[in-house]
Amino acid sequence: MPLVACDDSLLTVIDLQPRFWAERLDAEDKRRAEEAARRAAWLAAAAHALGVPAVITEEDPEINGPTDEAVLAPLRASAPVFTKTVFGLADCPEIMAAVRSTRRRTALLAGFETDVCVTHSAVGLGEAGYRVVIVEDAVYSPFGAHLPGIVRLRDLGFELMHCKNVYYDWIRTLPAARAFQEHNPELAHPPGFSL
């Protein structure tokens, strides 16, 4: 499998809505969910800085609230936000039209929940012919469902990558990495890992 090319990548941020973790989770699940959300926000900002388009979904925002502001901030001007009432984004024609309009063939998935909406979206995108990459440190499911979701995704044949792996696949060279960090100092120290 080749490296993930920046100019062929599309970031899909799936249901990264704080109400999924702010009120319903115990302390450990909440900590892990917040960590995944911070990494997804960093990835969204890095994607924006590198010209990688994004599509954002929200599940039932009247109940679950809007997408995390840290994710929306860098993407607000360029990424469409879609409400969905199905678990897999590929089952929504308007979302798939936005995905297709990017003309990118590699879909990177971040968001919630690993075992349901992320998995259903991965399967649908895969069936539509996309190379699907799960950014495993930027997805999460509570109540012990995260690891089984990751295992299922792996067993289904989807690629699993860390935010750091994605960054270096996108950047490719030391001069490009130095230039990125110089032009984006706020992204030079990502949450929970080093560049």
Task: Give the positions of each predicted feature.
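Active-site-adjacent betaalpha module
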Residues: P2-L10, L50, E62-L195
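Glycine-rich N-terminal segment of FAD-binding domains in flavoprotein oxidoreductases
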Residues: E58-E59
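N-terminal nucleotide-binding beta1-loop-alpha1 segment
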Residues: S9-Q17
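A short alpha/beta connector and helix-capping loop motif
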Residues: D7-S9, R24-V55
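Short acidic, Gly/Ser-rich segments with clustered Asp/Glu that frequently serve as metal-coordination loops
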Residues: Q17-E23
